[in-house]
Amino acid sequence: RDVLGSRGLGDVYKRQVDGKRIDKYSSRQLTAYRRYDIGFVFQFYNLVQNLTVKENVELATQICKEPLDIVKTIEAVGLSDRIGNFPSQLSGGEQQRVAIARALAKNPKMLLCDEPTGALDINTGKTILKLLSDMCKKNGITVVVITHNQAISAMGDKVIKIKNGIVDSVVINDNPVSVDAIDW
């Protein structure tokens, strides 16, 4: 799947996903596209403080067509023992994993992740990167990771470097490395 934008791409101005020009979508079409096809992992977790881990993940699945199993998704991010806890009872890394589970549970076509390992130690970070990689392969999800961590870029099929808000380089990586080979 290609995602293209205008900044740094010369005269090209199109935003194309799955062969569809989403820059031509109406406001209603864009809302539906974001609701059903995109999962977001924000740098700030945006968890609902008076909902449990399970309820926070469940919240996202209420607006999608074919959600993944909530409990299995929470298990996959290593939080099955915290399923009944509230965000205030979780560490920053655990809250980040709830946010990742919430995005994955939507079963999106594309997952946009802003610093998904930012609050995680290296081992948990690698676990999450492996999960994202496996989900990408298993479910055909396009995963876009925005990060300052250069080591992670070696995992990507396509690496786009941004400098001063403009595309500086685009590199196709024919041999992405496994998460086990990454160290930071």
Which residue stretches match the model-derived regions?
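Conserved beta-strand-loop-alpha-helix hinge in the C-terminal portion
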Residues: 166-184
